Amino acid sequence: MSMSDPIADMLTRIRNAQLSEKTSVVMPASKLKAAIAQVLKDEGYVEDFIVHEAGGKSILDISLKYYAGRPVIERIERVSRPGLRIYKGSNKLPNVMNGLGVAIVSTSKGVMTERKARANGVGGEVLCIVA
């Protein structure tokens, strides 16, 4: 059976790995997952990520980040989902925890944070929020 929401699966794997204090988490890769991982790395929520081939399939390996023994990511949630897509214009993008968190948005100019999308004047699909 195919997976109905691979992005929700990615976020759940990250959340569960951090709760069990794993150093890294491995999952099937895609261009969108790699773009989300890049945003998480740029914003300082994960140490690093690597996309590599294993048995003819692409694998995404994300190194998780901790501060003082606690996970850096306190909250990671899917917003737009296959059954209910959420699209917002540049002026309606959510402000997560008054700027302490980020919303990851898929725009026509690529996957970016809501701050960069607002600065570029583009809206898009709100994939998830991270705090």
Curated annotation (Swiss-Prot):
Q: Which GO terms describe its biological process?
A: translation
Per its record, what are the GO molecular function terms?
Answer: rRNA binding; structural constituent of ribosome
| GO CC entries | ribonucleoprotein complex; ribosome
Highest taxon above the source species: Bacteria
Q: Which InterPro entries match?
A: Ribosomal_uS8 (IPR000630), Ribosomal_uS8_CS (IPR047863), Ribosomal_uS8_sf (IPR035987)
Report the Pfam families cross-referenced here: Ribosomal_S8
Keywords in UniProt for this one?
A: Ribonucleoprotein, Ribosomal protein, RNA-binding, rRNA-binding
Describe the family membership recorded for this protein in Swiss-Prot or TrEMBL: Belongs to the universal ribosomal protein uS8 family.
- Tell me, how does this one assemble? Part of the 30S ribosomal subunit. Contacts proteins S5 and S12.
- What function does this protein fulfil? One of the primary rRNA binding proteins, it binds directly to 16S rRNA central domain where it helps coordinate assembly of the platform of the 30S subunit.
From the Swiss-Prot or TrEMBL record, give the protein name.
Small ribosomal subunit protein uS8
Q: What organism is the protein native to? A: Nitrosospira multiformis (strain ATCC 25196 / NCIMB 11849 / C 71)
Give me the gene this protein comes from: rpsH
